[in-house]
Design a protein with these regions (language model features):
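Ligand-binding clefts/hinges and TM-proximal coupling segments of bilobed small-molecule sensing domains
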Residues: 21, 48-52, 190-205, 244-247, ...
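Extracytoplasmic small-molecule ligand-binding "clamshell" domains
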Residues: 49-137
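A ligand-binding cleft/hinge motif common to bilobed small-molecule-binding domains
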Residues: 120-121, 137-147, 194-197, 211, ...
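Periplasmic-binding protein-like
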Residues: 156-163, 237-278, 296-306
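C-terminal motif of bacterial Sec signal peptides marking the signal peptidase cleavage site
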Residues: 14-18
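Bacterial lipoprotein signal-peptidase II cleavage site
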Residues: 19-32
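Extended ligand-binding regions for polar small-molecule ligands
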Residues: 20, 98-107, 167, 181, ...
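Acidic, polar ligand-binding/catalytic clefts
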Residues: 106, 111-177, 254
Length: 306
């Protein structure tokens, strides 16, 4: 079964390589907006019924929520491919989280359904029974643990900043070198709150999605964006006028950058089942695939989201 997961990710990367030259539209609307399609049915396992001990939102289906605008973890595209999932309105979701969701659904004997949901709506959606789980590059912060239960991390990254390639910030070595500069993060995420670790920073009001943030950076409204490395790599691969800066240990942000899967508080049966599926894929396989997807320029992909 582990081989299925790795092969699916390899397929996603090959498809991306053939399409990453598509048009890049920085002003394209995000799939994570409130107007995003409400639901989708996806090609997952054809098994009927699945694990009888599991109760899911829709019997026989594993329904997950994600932004569908956070490449390389998840994004929206217009083409139907082997790894993509139909989300309605002639659009498809793809990315690491989608492949992960497919693999887990396969292990549970269920069919995968993906719902595009704005970031701030993900926790309410899992708690009100709209979705079974959140697979969206989400970090298990203490605050979130009060509202939902998390699996062990399925990927661990590190935090960087994205800057314009012609900026004098390309050679900085510490986050404190950003003092006095305009720095922006994503709304309601760790990537916004950590900005205050920079002394004297001009903490710009966060935006909801990276497509909007990239526009702000390219237009000069802000000097730098915070992001985790795979996302930054994807942004840079799609936007040759941008680059990202990594920091040595002790000079960067102090933050937990691991990501986990969330379920409704107290849904132990589903949590344990998902955890078991994750355990069947080695940490090495999980860690290697995200950077590979990012390197293929996944941020624009076929839909040109950034």
């Amino acid at each position: 079964m582990k081989k299925l997961f790795v092969c699916a990710l390899a397929a996603a990367m090959m498809l991306a390589a053939g399409c990453s030259s598509g048009s890049s539209s920085s002003s394209a609307p995000s799939a994570a907006s409130p107007a995003a399609p409400a639901a989708s049915q996806a090609a997952g396992s054809e098994a009927a019924g699945g694990d009888a001990s599991l109760t899911t939102v829709t019997p026989g289906k594993f329904t997950i929520g994600m932004e569908c605008a956070y490449a390389p973890f998840n994004w929206t595209q217009l083409e139907k491919t082997d790894t993509a999932v139909d989300i309605g309105s002639a659009s498809y979701a793809d990315g690491y989280d989608v492949v992960m969701g497919k693999y887990i659904a396969e292990q549970l004997g269920l069919e995968l359904v993906v719902k595009p949901i704005a970031w701030e709506g993900l926790e309410p959606a899992v708690n009100n029974g709209e979705i079974d789980a959140i697979i969206a590059g989400m970090t298990a912060t203490p605050e979130r643990r009060e509202n939902v239960d998390f699996t062990d991390p399925y990927y661990e990254s590190k935090m960087v900043v994205i800057v314009r390639k012609d900026s004098d910030l390309t050679n900085i070595t510490s986050i404190q070198d950003l003092s006095g500069r305009k720095v922006q993060g994503q709304l309601n995420t760790l990537y916004d709150t950590v900005i205050d670790q920079i002394e004297g920073v001009d903490h710009v009001t966060p935006l909801a999605t990276y497509p909007l943030m990239v526009v702000a950076l390219q237009s000069g409204e802000v000097d730098a964006l915070t992001a985790e490395l795979p996302v930054a790599a994807g942004v840079v691969a799609s936007n040759p006028d941008l680059t990202y800066v990594e920091f040595a240990e002790g000079s960067g942000f102090e933050a937990d950058t691991s990501v986990s899967i969330a379920v409704k508080k107290g849904n132990t049966a589903l949590l344990d089942a998902i955890q078991s599926a994750l355990a069947s894929v080695s940490e090495e396989d999980r860690q290697q695939q995200v950077p590979a997807l990012a390197a293929e320029g996944q941020v624009i992909h076929r839909a040109g989201r950034l």
